[in-house]
């Protein structure tokens, strides 16, 4: 069993260099549009990655139908693009505006979101409370198809409901985070499963070609260019999606001595080598 946290804009500016946790689940956003991305998502993702903390994500739902849940999934995918997640991407269903839609509709919404994520190459799951999984959702159906993240803060919670991750408090305290934070346990090796399957932005390792061994299969490097900025961006995004390292160098010029001085000054300001 390992221990983790889940965070959103409500935790403010997190000092990830001080955070000690086995994993972190980040709120990517909410609703049906990519512009509803959590204001702290990019910063939290970069900070956790820099600190060496494995991450997953969740999308808070306001959907009222399976079609709206699919739209939420598409928005979520836009926000996740180009990133790598060692833990699942969860559909967070708990809003009071949804609770009277009925078990069939709510369960279908979970399926619509998760199926859309899975078709795009992500390991998807559902987050809800014990109450919702018992009274609002078809837990057995969902647990048979997706990973479950269950919230229950009681000491004597129902242990018979299947789950891989358990949110056990909303009152945790962790160095680097001001105020309270949700704490979770996890009993499944998600990083191993996800990376091996090539999901969540991690491309599958290619099989060696005939006549080459596994070491040779991963020995290729390419220098590409010159390329227009839009083309370079597409290539870099593709390489990162495959889990490959991109060492970028920029060639600028020809230019005047004045322009050269301005470029050198900016490179120095950014801490970049300029030759």
Segments predicted by a language model, with ranges:
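Functionally critical loop-and-helix segments that line ligand-binding/catalytic clefts
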Residues: 1-18, 139-214
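Hydrophobic anchor at the start of a short beta-strand
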Residues: 55, 123-125, 148, 246
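Structural recognition of alpha->loop->beta junctions
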Residues: 77-91, 95-97, 136-163, 269-271
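Substrate-binding cleft of extracellular glycoside hydrolase catalytic domains
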Residues: 1-123
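Short Gly/Pro-enriched loop/turn and capping motifs at secondary-structure junctions
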Residues: 96-98, 131-134, 154-158, 170-173, ...
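Solvent-exposed beta-strand motifs enriched in subsets of small alpha/beta binding domains
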Residues: 57-62, 206-275
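Aromatic-lined carbohydrate-recognition surfaces of secreted/lumenal glycan-active proteins
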Residues: 120-135
């Amino acid at each position: 069993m390992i221990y983790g946290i889940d965070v959103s804009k409500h935790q403010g500016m997190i000092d990830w260099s001080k955070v000690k946790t086995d994993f972190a689940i980040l709120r990517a956003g909410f609703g049906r549009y990519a512009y509803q991305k959590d204001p702290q998502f990019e910063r939290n993702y970069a900070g956790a990655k820099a600190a060496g903390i494995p991450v997953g994500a969740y999308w808070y739902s306001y959907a009222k139908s399976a079609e709206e849940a699919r739209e939420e999934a598409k928005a979520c995918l836009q926000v996740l693009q180009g990133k790598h997640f060692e833990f699942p991407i969860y559909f967070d269903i708990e809003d009071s505006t949804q609770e009277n839609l009925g078990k069939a509709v709510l369960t279908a919404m979970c399926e619509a979101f998760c199926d859309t994520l899975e078709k795009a190459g992500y390991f998807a799951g559902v987050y809800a409370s014990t109450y919702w999984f018992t009274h609002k959702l078809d837990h057995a159906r969902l647990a048979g198809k997706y990973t479950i993240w269950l919230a229950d803060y009681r000491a004597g919670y129902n242990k018979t409901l299947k789950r891989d991750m358990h949110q056990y408090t909303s009152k945790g305290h962790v160095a680097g985070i001001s105020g309270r934070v949700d704490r979770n346990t996890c009993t499944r090796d998600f990083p191993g499963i996800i990376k091996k399957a090539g999901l969540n932005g991690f491309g599958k390792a290619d099989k060696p070609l005939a006549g080459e061994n596994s070491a040779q299969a991963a020995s290729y490097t390419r220098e590409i260019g010159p390329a227009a900025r839009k083309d370079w961006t597409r290539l870099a995004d593709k390489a990162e999606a495959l889990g490959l390292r991109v060492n970028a160098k920029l060639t600028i010029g020809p230019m005047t001595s004045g322009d050269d001085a301005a470029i050198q000054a900016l490179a120095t300001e950014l801490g970049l080598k300029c030759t």
